[in-house]
Amino acid sequence: MLLRQYINVPRLGEIMNLKELTVILIIPIVYLGVCGCFEIVPKSFYDNFSSYNVGDKAPFGEWKVKEGGFKIEAILSEDKKTLNKVAVPINNGIIYIDKNYTDFKFIVDIKRLEESDSPKIYFRLINNANAGYYIDIEGFDRGYVLYKFNGTKVEKLAESYDAAPAGTDFYRYEVVAKDNKIIFLAGGQKYIEYTDNNTPILKGGIGIGGGRAYYDNVRVEPIE
């Protein structure tokens, strides 16, 4: 009697209430997962292609192929002292990371093979990269153009007739996407700022390719 007096032994009704509470807590979580209402924000992403072998062809790592092909090559660093692995399109190929980034900074280093080349930067890609936005880095440093596309439909949204003097050197390009505003920078200088008020795409993956160039140091950083 004394032992039972000091030990809190749960009654049957209390056990049932605990089970009911567990069910009540689990059902909404399962529902959120099934309906897609609950979504985990993707973490930051970085790839300098050093973990792959020279000659590897996409898909590799987290990269998927949208069209054409991509391969890993080794080229001399800018100081010509070491070999550096980079990603190169095959037949103007495009590869992409299939994640739902909403607000983010997307940074990539690009080096044209020839001054006439026009590589591209893709972002907020959806539907297996069949829709989204891209920046066209025009050849001969003529400028930059922001496009929105859906399948074969392509719409020019904004452009800059000024451009950084990249030539055939590695240059750092950056896209900042927050809500429906898009900012494009080259070498830290802003060249395009555009607000898409016509059914904007507010989340999606990122991609590279669409023109002859070396790509390196691809980075995506979510922003608040």
Swiss-Prot record:
What is a GO molecular function of this protein?
A: hydrolase activity
Q: What is its main location?
A: membrane
Q: What InterPro entries does the record tag this protein with?
A: 3-keto-disaccharide_hydrolase
Compartments it resides in = Membrane
Gene Ontology CC entries for this record = membrane
- Keyword Membrane part of the UniProt annotation: yes
User: What protein name applies here?
Assistant: Uncharacterized protein MJ0945
